[in-house]
Structure formats: C-alpha cells, structure tokens
Amino acid sequence: LRVAGSHGQTVIHLPSGPSPSTLQLGEPSFLAEELGVPVVSDFRPRDMAAGGEGAPLIPFFDEFVFGAGPPRVLQNIGGIANASLAGRGVKTFGFDTGPGNCLMDLAARRLSGGRLAYDRGGALALRGRPDEARARNLLRLPFFSRRPPKSLDRSQFGAGFLARHFPSRGKSPEDLMATVTYFTALTIADAYRRFVFPRARVREAVLSGGGSLNRALVLGLRRLLHPLPVRIISDFGIAPLAKEPAAMALMAALAVEGRINHCPKATGARGARVLGKITPA
C-alpha cells in the first residue's frame, strides 16, 4: 500500500450562493497513523474554490475506466444518484440526477417503524403498485429542469420532502415504497432524456452503488429506459459497492503525483485542478 484516499462522510454540501461550503467527517491523521501511508482527503473544497460544485467527482473515474469504449451513461446510485457520460467521441461530463437511495431508505425506516434501514433488494416495493401520476408530477420541481453542472445535498430530499410529497394516509406500505422507488427511477430516466441523450448516442447504461442491488429500482429503470440496455457494473469486473472506493484510490494516487484528478466539465470548475489535501504518513 502506497497511499490511501478518504472521502469521508458528507454532512453538508451547499455548493450554491455567495459562500459555498461542504463538510465531510473523518480525520485523515488517524488513518495515516494506522495505515502508515500518506492519506489524501477533503477532495471537494479545491474544486469549489475554482468555481465548481465540488460534485460529482465520479465522472473522472468513469472517463479513466470507460473513456476508450463506446459511449455509455454510468449511473452511480448512492444516497444521491449521479450520472456520467463517457466514451469514444464524446466529451465526458456528469451531474447529480436526483435522489438515489436516500428517499427509499427514509421510506423503509418510516414504514417499518425503524426496524428496516433500507428496502433490501427492493422486496417491499416489488409487492406494491406505484402511484405513477404522483411521481411524474414531482418532475416539475426546479432541480430537475436545471441544466448541469448541478449537485445536491441529500437534505434536499430528506424526511421533510418524504412527508410532504409521499404521505402515508390511504396507501399500503408496499404501494408507498413502490411509489418512492418508481420516483427515484423516473428522475434518473428523465435526466437522461433532458441532458444525456441529446449529447450522444448512448450504447447502454451501467449501474453501480447500493441502488444497483435494488431489484425494484433496476426493473423500473429497465422499463423506463427501454430499449436502452441497462447493465450492472459487476458485468465489467467491478463490484457495485467498490466503484466509489476505487475512484477515491485513483484520485489519491494522482494527487500525490501532482496530477489532475477531477472532471471540471462535470463540476463546473474554471479549469482542471489537483484535488485533495495530503496527510503524510
């Protein structure tokens, strides 16, 4: 092991306004002490200092891994969902498409009285029927029509949003979970139609992150994006939950060499920079 990259736990991300700010928890000094190698952390602030949103960071990794192949849309579904367009003959770019797992996880906790941290495999949603009209109506919210570059803090799709737009009254737990899951898939498909498909003839979509393990979400995406093939990143030898850690490792390795490690086209930064702060071993 030569170097480690630590993204940390994001507790706030406010890229807009006169004083952009972001905060990730996780002290790299303890990691450096434990691992005995330099640790690169705090990647987002440098991008924001250069006028960017500080997110998404993953398009750089997507270009590095998939840039020589046919045009693909790479969809990471963590708490927030973000998409990258990468491949031969296209200019790599990316943006946050909307909620990823955050709303579905909140719904699972609310509906189970706290017993479930998430809807494992989409089992609850698969037993329900989504209210498609309610979900489609929410696409009128300003974020979805805003052009990239754009990024989100998960608080924008937090408990208040869930209670306001997905009330439990008159709905079975299965139907409510199905509706929230359908809405999540719908925001991704809608983002492609608005911002990805006009830029390139995409061969396929490739999913990663925890959301790619949710069968209800994946089935919803396949229906909404048909006939575009929707694959899982494990088809390419990368575990779905390993993509973001691999991206941090790549960014860290490049940072200690003083090499560019982000995609300004995705974040809106004024130019290419070296992101991250280095804590020596």
Model-derived segments and their meaning:
Residues V202-R222:
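Glycine-rich phosphate-binding loops at beta-strand->alpha-helix junctions
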Residues F93-A185, A189, G258, T267, ...:
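Conserved ATP-utilizing enzyme core subdomain
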Residues R222-A247:
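Conserved phosphate-binding/catalytic loops in two-lobed NTP-binding clefts
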Residues L1-G26:
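Short beta-strand-loop/turn "lid" adjacent to the catalytic site in phosphate-handling enzymes
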Residues M248-H262:
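Alpha-helix capping/hinge segments and adjacent helical runs
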